[in-house]
Amino acid sequence: MKYRYIASCVFTRDYPELSLRIQDYLKERFGMEIIRCCAEKYKVRQFEEVMAPSVCEQWKATPHYIPFEPNTTMISICHNCTAVFQESHPDINVLSLWEFILQHDADFHYPDYGCERMTIQDCWRQYDNQAEQAAVRELLRRMNIEVVEMAENREHTRFCGTSLYRPAPPRNLKMAPKRFVEDAEGMFVTHTEEEQKQLMEEHCQQYQTKKVVAYCHYCTEGLRLVGQPHYHIAELLFPYSV
């Protein structure tokens, strides 16, 4: 079985140094092939122009997209990429990075966070992905984090940061219509920036812990907007120093 990791244009834009650490880990540990994006020729120049200077050259040197062979598994850190592949490439197996680590790296060094309590924020974009949800919780357990569940967790979540407070990109509607059209009734309702912030502040009142853990960069975008202390799970797994 061959594995190929999609580094994600948006994740790398939002978490440039972290993205490089993950890419280096996968290349050095598994010799894994890395590409940027889940869609051929999608906003190539636009994302090159907004990448942080520290990652720009490596990003440009990374292939934008390579067609997948049937025996190749796509490793994903982005719920958008996952949805696109699940619908546009149903013959290609898709595995979250979190599941891959658990299944293939018995020697992974898990940082110890001292039994700190953190709320887990699930994501609507993969509300029905039980395997990923379980993997995230197991990784948190292995990092000695006490997980606090929300009432609207797992398949009940309707949260994806502020991304659901603006129209869905046309590309998503075309490449993943089940997720972003059929399953999205009542989602992607346009709100002003002021309304988005108010909705996010109201959502964050549900959290029972100081810190929140999410595993979607669209979710963390919303948390960041209102100053909610949070981590992307990748930040916990791949810190600057362990």
Predicted feature locations:
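Iron-sulfur cluster-binding electron-transfer modules in prokaryotic oxidoreductases
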Residues: 1-242
